[in-house]
Amino acid sequence: MLGPGQVRLRPRVWRDKAGGRVADGASGLPPARGSWRETGTGRALGASSPPRPAQGSSSPGIQSGPSSRPGSPRGAEQAGTPRPRLSLGISQATGSAARWRTRRTGKGLGYNSDEIRPRTLLIEHLMEGGRRDHHTMTVLWGTQEIIVAEFHKKIKEAFEVFDHESNNTVDVREIGTIIRSLGCCPTEGELHDLIAEVEEEEPTGYIRFEKFLPVMTEILLERKYRPIPEDVLLRAFEVLDSAKRGFLTKDELIKYMTEEDGVSLRRPG
């Protein structure tokens, strides 16, 4: 019978590694700390584990750590001596997963991966961008070479129309017509500046193709002169195409361009 205020305490029961039940008050002592399992739960017992055996006990599974000294009270620790570390029992797979998570989060490794990863991505992006830019520049250079070759061809054809002596020279008075035939519409001042640039140091009244070609190529590439308005071109074509065929032959175009009197661009009728 329990008296007033008394409570019956249920003995705690542990299961040792062999599967046997060991309870408080039973013969012998529970197994070593770290291998206790509470009956029915399978959980390891920590702070609620049963008391350690007295000094000198030979119970299996209990080892005296460096903190125990003969004659000292149980649990007393030697000053400056670290307590022994207990194995956490982490499996290799769990440890690998933890290390992978640590690498991804950067925690505990002395750096912030949130800063390093974007920096790495930026470097990779710049490297990839550099390769793309190099490829793009290669294509652009190849395209420009094609464009320059086309310009050279057009300039040569327009120049040859007025090279009556076939000696790679034209009359300086024909330069304006040649430039306009290439789709440019310079002002009078721009035309005078160009002629001054391509003329010889001692003006002869003629312009050599070798000096005209690079200057005119640069003008076409940089589009220095405003283009001839489309309505002007259309009106000129309608005047020249008197038969209303919708096209002009090369001979007709040369004839019209080399006529001394020129052609009026006023609409007929």
Swiss-Prot record:
Domain EF-hand: 150-185, 228-263
Region (Disordered): 1-113
Family annotation (CDD domains): EFh (cd00051)
SUPFAM superfamilies for this protein: EF-hand (SSF47473)
SMART domains found in the cross-reference section: EFh
Entry's Gene Ontology molecular function annotations: calcium ion binding
Alphabetical keyword list: Cell projection, Cilium, Cytoplasm, Cytoskeleton, Flagellum, Repeat
Compositionally biased region (Low complexity): 54-76
One GO CC annotation: cytoskeleton
Subcellular location: Cytoplasm, Cytoskeleton, Flagellum axoneme
Chief localization: cytoplasm
Chain coiled-coil ranges: none
PROSITE patterns the UniProt entry points to: EF_HAND_2
InterPro entries to which the protein is assigned, alphabetical: EF-hand-dom_pair, EF_hand_dom
PANTHER family according to UniProt: DYNEIN REGULATORY COMPLEX PROTEIN 8 (PTHR46763:SF1)
Family of this protein: Belongs to the DRC8 family.
Assembly description: Component of the nexin-dynein regulatory complex (N-DRC).
Record function comment: Component of the nexin-dynein regulatory complex (N-DRC), a key regulator of ciliary/flagellar motility which maintains the alignment and integrity of the distal axoneme and regulates microtubule sliding in motile axonemes.
Protein name, UniProt field: Dynein regulatory complex protein 8
Native source species: Homo sapiens
